[in-house]
From Swiss-Prot:
Organism from which the protein derives: Streptococcus pyogenes serotype M5 (strain Manfredo)
Protein name: Small ribosomal subunit protein uS7
TM region(s), chain numbering: none
Family: Belongs to the universal ribosomal protein uS7 family.
PROSITE patterns hit by this protein: RIBOSOMAL_S7 (PS00052)
Keyword DNA damage among UniProt keywords: no
InterPro entries assigned: Ribosomal_uS7, Ribosomal_uS7_bac/org-type, Ribosomal_uS7_CS, Ribosomal_uS7_dom, Ribosomal_uS7_dom_sf
Gene name of this polypeptide: rpsG
Any one GO MF annotation of this record: rRNA binding
One cellular-component annotation, GO: small ribosomal subunit
Pfam families cross-referenced by the UniProt entry: Ribosomal_S7
Role noted for this protein: One of the primary rRNA binding proteins, it binds directly to 16S rRNA where it nucleates assembly of the head domain of the 30S subunit. Is located at the subunit interface close to the decoding center, probably blocks exit of the E-site tRNA.
């Protein structure tokens, strides 16, 4: 591991349509092979499908979904006296958002709908209703942290 200073965090510019940084980060997560235009089209089409299906503002639905996906606790491996313990720790805000977006996009890609636009839209709507694979991932993470609560005193 490098002993030099940590690289500075780069600021993400808000997207032009919704003026939101989290939407830009979603576009970056959806992007494959550097094709940002294609990724932006997928995300914006998914948002218009959400607006059509729910009648609510797509950005509000997305933010509700993200609140339902982002984890509060996770477990981290800690070596104590020759054995590894899964120690529950709180998740930092930046990592919460990153994990939430990662789980959302991965769950969308695993879905069965025909186009990525449909998969993303359905997964966001499911997450906003507290269902779907991405919310299940969060629940599993919280369950794991709860199960290992006995090791919380090993926190560092």
């Amino acid at each position: 591991m490098s002993r030099k200073n940590q690289a500075p965090k780069r600021e993400v510019l808000p997207d032009p349509l919704y003026n939101s940084k989290i939407v830009t980060r979603l576009i970056n997560r959806v992007m494959l092979d550097g094709k940002r235009g294609t990724a932006a089209t997928i995300v914006y089409d998914a948002f218009s499908a959400i607006k059509e299906a729910t009648g609510n503002d797509a950005l509000e639905v997305f933010e509700t979904a993200m609140d339902n996906i982002m984890p509060v606790l996770e477990v981290r491996a800690r070596r104590v006296g020759g054995s590894n313990y899964q120690v529950p720790v709180e998740v930092r805000p930046e990592r919460r958002t990153t994990l939430g977006l990662r789980w959302l996009v991965n769950a969308s890609r695993a879905r069965g709908e025909h186009t990525m636009k449909d998969r993303l839209a359905k997964e966001i709507m499911d997450a906003a209703n507290n269902t779907g694979a991405s919310v299940k991932k969060r629940e599993d993470t919280h369950k794991m942290a709860e199960a290992n609560r006995a090791f919380a005193h090993f926190r560092w």
